[in-house]
From Swiss-Prot:
Record-given protein name: E3 ubiquitin-protein ligase rififylin
Gene: Rffl
Outcome of gene disruption: No visible phenotype.
Catalytic activity: S-ubiquitinyl-[E2 ubiquitin-conjugating enzyme]-L-cysteine + [acceptor protein]-L-lysine = [E2 ubiquitin-conjugating enzyme]-L-cysteine + N(6)-ubiquitinyl-[acceptor protein]-L-lysine
Zinc finger (FYVE-type): 55-107
Recorded GO MF terms: p53 binding; protease binding; protein kinase binding; ubiquitin protein ligase activity; ubiquitin protein ligase binding; zinc ion binding
Cystine pairings recorded for this chain: none
PTM characteristics: Autoubiquitinated. Palmitoylated.
Domain notes: The FYVE-type zinc finger domain is required for localization to the recycling endosome membranes and the function in endocytic recycling. The RING-type zinc finger is required for the ubiquitination of target proteins.
Tissue spec. comment: Ubiquitous. Detected in heart, brain, spleen, lung, liver, skeletal muscle, kidney, testis, thymus, whole embryo and embryonic stem cells.
Induction summary: Up-regulation by LPA/lysophosphatidic acid is dependent on GNA12.
Keywords associated with the record: Apoptosis, Cell membrane, Cytoplasm, Endosome, Lipoprotein, Membrane, Metal-binding, Palmitate, Phosphoprotein, Repeat, Transferase, Ubl conjugation, Ubl conjugation pathway, Zinc, Zinc-finger
Membrane-protein topology: Peripheral membrane protein
Length: 377
């Protein structure tokens, strides 16, 4: 029996067996020596960095973004609880320190009429300072509603520092600005109450003060403030309330609800948009309420002019109306004037009420995509 022959090839031991004439492979490969110059590398964490860890964000002013070099320059607003610098915050007398934006809102005494005069950006910034989301707000009234819902509680010490009142309250303004008389004791030690100081007030101002104090009962020892006063609404406000009551709740506003131009001033933003949408007037790009009021006013005047043009059956001389005026009548109802154009064909043959019901143009039978209101020059 011949001895098996062994040789080494490709790092494997191969043995030739004389019994079966098959190659027999050894399953253990020969370990190759490491190449020269290679060295063992220690394990390293890929998430580890030799650089020092970043420090926390430095406190900065919420308004201007300047970093505070020391804690002495950092001032906290009592209303929104945010940090501001000395420039972006203010303190009136011994009162609390407030940021300029919160100070402006406190000057309005959180009255709805005054808040509606403010810009939308200021309303959003104020709500953002109080961490209130405004993503779902589409109207200015919704922002004002959120501001009124989170107005801060004003303490008794802050009530003595009432902001400047509008011109509608001259007597109250004189009462708040003048020193306290002997009938009403002062609520804080900072208010003068000595007789010598009272006698130094001019006679006219003293009479105004007595008229304002005369409405206060003797057992009521606190001064009158805007939050506790009930004022009589003016004529303009009464007209606006009456005009809003004329609209039935739950029903969309219509141009036929308006009887005079003054009724437009009493409409809300939502009602103005409903009227424009029902008459196919585009109001995109209108950011303020007065822009919507201008378009509704123009729509109202144009509608009245067209109705006056086609309403009479006789002219001024008593004769029949010329047949040429029939061209301005809607070809569907023959009652209302033509005031809309059908797209995409561009034919003007119907009024707004009939145009929104048309599926196809009555002239060319083309499919109507939409109807747009037009104004006659």
């Amino acid at each position: 029996m011949s001895q098996p022959s062994l040789w080494k090839d490709s790092h494997y031991f191969i043995m030739w067996a004389s019994c079966c004439n098959w190659f027999c492979l050894d399953g253990q490969p020969e370990e190759a020596p490491p190449p020269q110059g290679a060295r063992t590398q220690a394990y390293s964490n890929p998430g580890y960095s030799s650089f020092p860890s970043p420090t926390g964000s430095e406190p900065s002013c919420k308004a201007c973004g300047v970093h505070f070099a020391s804690t002495t320059r950092k001032q906290t607003c009592l209303d929104c609880k945010k940090n501001f610098c000395m420039t972006c915050s203010s303190q009136e007398g011994n009162g609390p320190r407030l940021c300029l934006l919160c100070l402006r809102f406190r000057a309005t005494a959180f009255q709805r009429e005054e808040l509606m005069k403010m810009k939308v950006k200021d309303l959003r910034d104020y709500l953002s300072l109080h961490d209130i989301s405004t993503e779902m707000c589409r109207e200015k009234e919704e922002l004002v509603f959120l501001v009124l819902g989170q107005q801060p509680v004003i303490s008794e010490a802050d009530r003595t520092r009432v902001p400047h009142l509008p011109q509608a309250f001259p007597e109250q303004q004189a009462f708040l600005t003048q020193p306290q008389t002997s009938t009403v004791p002062p609520t804080s030690p900072g208010l003068p109450s000595s007789p010598a100081q009272v006698t130094s007030v001019p006679l006219a101002q003293d009479q105004e003060t007595q008229q304002a104090v005369g409405h206060v009962s003797q057992d009521h020892e606190e001064p009158i403030f805007p939050e506790s006063t009930a004022r009589v609404p003016t004529e303009d406000e009464t007209q606006s309330v009456d005009s809003e009551d004329s609209f039935v709740p739950g029903r969309r506003a219509s141009l036929s609800d308006l009887t005079h131009l003054e009724d437009i001033e009493g409409l809300t933003v939502r009602q103005l948009k409903e009227i424009l949408a029902r008459n196919f007037v585009n109001y995109k790009g209108c950011c303020e309420k007065w822009e919507l009021m201008e378009r509704v006013t123009r729509l109202y005047k144009d509608q009245k002019g067209l109705q006056h043009l086609v309403s009479g059956n006789e002219d001024q001389n008593g004769g029949a109306v010329p047949s040429g005026l029939e061209e301005n009548l809607c070809k569907i109802c023959m009652d209302s004037p033509i005031d809309c154009v059908l797209l995409e064909c561009g034919h003007m043959v119907t009024c707004t009420k009939c145009g929104k019901r048309m599926n196809e143009c009555p002239i060319c039978r083309q499919y109507v995509i939409r109807a747009v209101h037009v104004f006659r020059s």
